[in-house]
Amino acid sequence: MSDEEHQFESKADAGASKTYPQQAGTIRKSGYIVIKGRPCKVVEVSTSKTGKHGHAKCHFVAIDIFTGKKLEDIVPSSHNCDVPHVNRTDYQLIDISEDGFVSLLTDNGNTKDDLRLPTDDSLLSQIKDGFAEGKDLVVSVMSAMGEEQINALKDIGPK
């Protein structure tokens, strides 16, 4: 045995993978797919027949779930694609800070203070107006591949 000590620095975070493999031919419209490293919702799928050389191909048109940008990809239908683990969680809105962060109440009674207000103008104004009126608001937070963003709002009545 060696007397040397080895220090290992792990660059990856522990825990579950951000994506899972799925065969391209089985991914359907309104499913999720990773295109160019971004989690996307599939809006259109078309398949081409097998050519003289090669496989049938799937043409995916998808929208980035965080930025709203349209992305496209063509993959042989027998190949595996990365599919993001997408979670949607509802939190009660407690406070909006002046620097654009929100304070949210989790199910177990803790607060979550690391999310910014959404960039979508109509959703942003609905949240600010509802909060200013003193309504009880519940925001829906979508998370995938290490990113989180507020993407919907529910009004559960006055406080």
Swiss-Prot record:
Record keywords: Hypusine, Initiation factor, Protein biosynthesis
Comp. bias (Basic and acidic residues): 1-12
Post-translational modifications reported in the UniProt record: Lys-52 undergoes hypusination, a unique post-translational modification that consists in the addition of a butylamino group from spermidine to lysine side chain, leading to the formation of the unusual amino acid hypusine. eIF-5As are the only known proteins to undergo this modification, which is essential for their function.
Keyword Protein biosynthesis: yes
Classification via SMART domains: eIF-5a
Any one GO molecular-function label of the UniProt entry: translation elongation factor activity
Domain of life: Eukaryota
Family: Belongs to the eIF-5A family.
PANTHER family (alphabetical): TRANSLATION INITIATION FACTOR 5A FAMILY MEMBER
Name the UniProt record assigns to this protein: Eukaryotic translation initiation factor 5A-4
Annotated organism of origin: Solanum tuberosum (Potato)
